């Protein structure tokens, strides 16, 4: 999940990396999905024009079933300085937002909730973010959304087009243009085919395990480069700085929830 539970742990990890000159790659596996990578390329190639907003939802109903049916792991039922649901889910949401748009949040507002029978934890949260270029973001993470299993959904809106990707249909990327033009791309007919690393031909869905496999393959390439040059560059492999920045954003969200105000991300 998250690289660390709080900023102090993250800084300790950085010190260990500096002392050992070590290699660190954090498993942000959702950007391993082929069509998420294709969406990123559409952003880079200007398909959407100026980006206006991104909405990401990541919700399930694991904490709102009948008591006898719920058996959550113990670590999910304890909140630290940063609520576990943020470390579990929102860390991936923040990563995807930056991965897809290339933009860094400047400030955050947050509203945390508790709806389940499990006392003392946050099990539902909204986060909103502002960005330097005027883009806005809306994030929702929840363990108490009845009817949803692991409903990761990304919606992106620009001045020229919008897009939607849903994890339960990972093969499809929907892009909507002006004049009601709607296009659906999959691994067999998408632009930027070089972004699609696949083990099965189109029609054989590349799901969750394949997304991990894509990332691990990229990490292996990055490790080979690191061993040769002492550093690595990869558009898909993220180390300490990216993971730490995500924790900084989540820490600011905690402060925002307490003060009920926008908090700048330093």
Locate each region found by the language model.
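Beta-strand-loop-alpha-helix segment that lines the small-molecule cofactor/substrate pocket
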Residues: 1-31, 46
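C-terminal glycine/acidic-rich active-site capping loop/insertion
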Residues: 29, 126, 131, 155, ...
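Predominantly a Rossmann-like dinucleotide-binding segment in NAD(P)-dependent oxidoreductases
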Residues: 22-25, 30-120, 126, 173, ...
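Glycine-rich, aromatic-lined ligand/substrate-binding cores of catalytic
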Residues: 102-108, 115-162, 167-171
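C-terminal helix-rich "cap/oligomerization" subdomain common to oxidoreductases
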Residues: 10-14, 19, 180, 218-266
């Amino acid at each position: 999940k998250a690289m660390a539970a709080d900023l102090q742990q993250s800084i300790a990890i950085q010190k260990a990396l500096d002392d050992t000159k070590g290699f660190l790659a954090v498993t942000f596996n959702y950007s391993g999905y082929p069509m998420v990578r294709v969406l990123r390329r559409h952003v880079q190639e200007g398909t959407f024009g100026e980006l206006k907003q991104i909405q990401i939802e990541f919700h399930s109903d694991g904490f709102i079933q009948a008591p006898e049916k719920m058996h959550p792991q113990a670590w999910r039922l304890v909140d630290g300085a940063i609520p576990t649901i943020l470390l579990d889910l929102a860390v991936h949401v923040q990563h995807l937002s930056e991965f897809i748009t290339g933009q860094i949040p400047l400030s955050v507002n947050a509203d945390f909730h508790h709806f389940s029978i499990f006392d003392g934890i946050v099990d539902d949260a909204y986060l909103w973010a502002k960005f330097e270029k005027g883009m806005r973001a809306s994030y929702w993470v929840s363990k108490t959304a009845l009817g949803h299993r692991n409903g990761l959904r990304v919606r992106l809106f620009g001045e020229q087009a919008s897009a939607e990707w849903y994890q339960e249909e990972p093969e499809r990327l929907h892009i909507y243009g002006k004049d009601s033009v709607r296009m659906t791309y999959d691994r067999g007919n998408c632009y930027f085919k070089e972004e699609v690393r696949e083990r099965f031909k189109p029609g054989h869905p590349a799901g969750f395990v394949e997304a991990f496999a894509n990332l691990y393959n990229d990490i292996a390439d990055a490790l080979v480069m690191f061993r040769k040059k002492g550093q690595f560059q990869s558009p898909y492999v993220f180390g300490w700085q990216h993971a730490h920045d995500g924790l900084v954003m989540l820490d600011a969200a905690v402060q925002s929830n307490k003060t009920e105000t926008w908090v700048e991300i330093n």
